[in-house]
Amino acid sequence: MQFRVLCLFMFVSAISCSDKSSAIVSDTKTDEPAKKPVQSGSQKKGACFTTKNAAWSSKVSALNVYWHYSWGVDANMKEPDSVRFVPMIWGKWSVEKSLLIVDSLAKVGKVKHLLGFNEPDGKEQANMTVDESLAFWPQLMKVNLPLGSPACVHADNDWMKGFMAKAAEKGYRVDFICVHWYGGANSQSLLDHLKLIHNLYNRPIWLTEFAPADWSATSPATSKVTKAMALTFMQQILPALEKMDYVERYSWFSADPGSAALGNSALFDTAGKLTLLGDYYSKF
């Protein structure tokens, strides 16, 4: 994936590309805790917003999701009622300290799963070798939560294949595969990719970041993925994901509406209101 910037925080609240980065931190209004219980029609549907986004809590609530992750480990007190927080160990920084937080949350039942490193195969993301990632892996396993794999730029690349092969040799536990996908507005292409990943690793899948994108676009207006195409894609893919037994969770990535590559796939407009796409996701 191209056009990335590095976002490192003490407890690591990061994302996967520069278009995405600007989208997540652009809100300026102060958010208030979302206290109204959220009832999602799906126990798979999720949201990904860093808590550095001022309006993250209200956005998570507006999307009516079952779960949320922030690329970090803190279960913020503003988490909407009935939404399950899922922590992530983003990279190699402060792993031990982050895991102490996760362990404390797990012991009181606040978290039930743990996500592995964010795009360690990306130089502008976690940027870790396979062996380096494996060296930390026993610490993640020790928390004794269902553990998601590193979420690679491409889950079928040599980095991921090497990690899974060496993890198997060492007897390390990887309970489900985290997948990122930013292809065009072709739902069958994504379904084929998920089938490939499942066949490769024989694990359940969490589709933790996905949205149709045009990486050659210079503005949303020039994108080959129009808003209408993004909506059609969503209308096709969400019911299909619900029917796939091995897809346990999914989370649409909502970029800044001004993003050239991903703006037409945004769930919120510049005023922070649901787009037509966001309204469909919320009601699904």
Residue ranges of each PLM-predicted region?
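Sec-dependent N-terminal signal peptides
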Residues: 5-12
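Bacterial Sec-dependent N-terminal signal peptides
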Residues: 14-40
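Aromatic-rich peripheral "rim/lid" segments of glycoside hydrolase catalytic domains that contact
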Residues: 25, 81-91, 199, 224, ...
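Loop/turn elements at helix/coil->beta-strand transitions in domains of secreted/extracellular proteins
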Residues: 41-45, 63-67, 81-85, 109-113, ...
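N-terminal carbohydrate-binding/catalytic regions of secreted carbohydrate-active enzymes
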Residues: 42-114, 131
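Generic structural signal for well-ordered alpha-helices
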Residues: 57, 99-103, 130-144, 160-164, ...
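Aromatic- and acid-rich polysaccharide-binding/catalytic face
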Residues: 70, 87, 118, 160-220, ...
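Active-site groove signature of glycoside hydrolases
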Residues: 106-130, 136, 148-156, 172-181, ...
